[in-house]
């Protein structure tokens, strides 16, 4: 590189650093060789973390911290994500999971160009079912929040979109999940508390999903 261009490059970088613009540069495109769903899981974790932070700030007079809420897992006894996604070297008895009645989702881009083991198929299928359950709950909850005269808080549409993107990546044939309708008059106070509970639980699950995708990317 000629001296003039080198000086120009250095000057540009110094200026960016001085103006603190370097931190706001676009995120690099994922490596083509990266496990396809890792990028989606990273986006999911970022989106739900941002939404949880927003909820805690907006609902500051509600019990919305991890110490104040009653922790609840809506996927309990319905999916086996934690067990199914254990690394093979930590799985002592795969036959226990084999005996489960499970329908596999194996036609998404997450499995593109990969040999699919039973455990990987079970793991990704379970993650898909988790996302589907949370998607239904969030859509139903958002419909109630939109009815609130105070219009205090709504779910971030980016988070809902990221959930849908990961579901599509796990299953090309994924259909739009209908939201549950309710004839009851919404209790907005309880709905907002429920939102905090759901966001805390979903962030924990998003951390698990991201770690699974990171492990699969490295394996």
From Swiss-Prot:
Signal peptide: 1-22
Disulphide bridges, residue numbers: 37-110, 64-196, 85-123
GO biological process entries: cell migration; cellular response to virus; defense response to Gram-positive bacterium; extrinsic apoptotic signaling pathway; immune response; interleukin-12-mediated signaling pathway; negative regulation of blood vessel endothelial cell proliferation involved in sprouting angiogenesis; negative regulation of interleukin-17 production
Single GO MF annotation: interleukin-12 beta subunit binding
Localization annotation: Secreted
Gene Ontology CC entries for this record: endoplasmic reticulum lumen; extracellular region; extracellular space; interleukin-12 complex; late endosome lumen
InterPro entries the record matches: 4_helix_cytokine-like_core, IL-12, IL-12_alpha
Subunit description: Heterodimer with IL12B; disulfide-linked. This heterodimer is known as interleukin IL-12. Heterodimer with EBI3/IL27B; not disulfide-linked. This heterodimer is known as interleukin IL-35. Interacts with NBR1; this interaction promotes IL-12 secretion.
Protein function: Heterodimerizes with IL12B to form the IL-12 cytokine or with EBI3/IL27B to form the IL-35 cytokine. IL-12 is primarily produced by professional antigen-presenting cells (APCs) such as B-cells and dendritic cells (DCs) as well as macrophages and granulocytes and regulates T-cell and natural killer-cell responses, induces the production of interferon-gamma (IFN-gamma), favors the differentiation of T-helper 1 (Th1) cells and is an important link between innate resistance and adaptive immunity.
The name this protein goes by in its record: Interleukin-12 subunit alpha
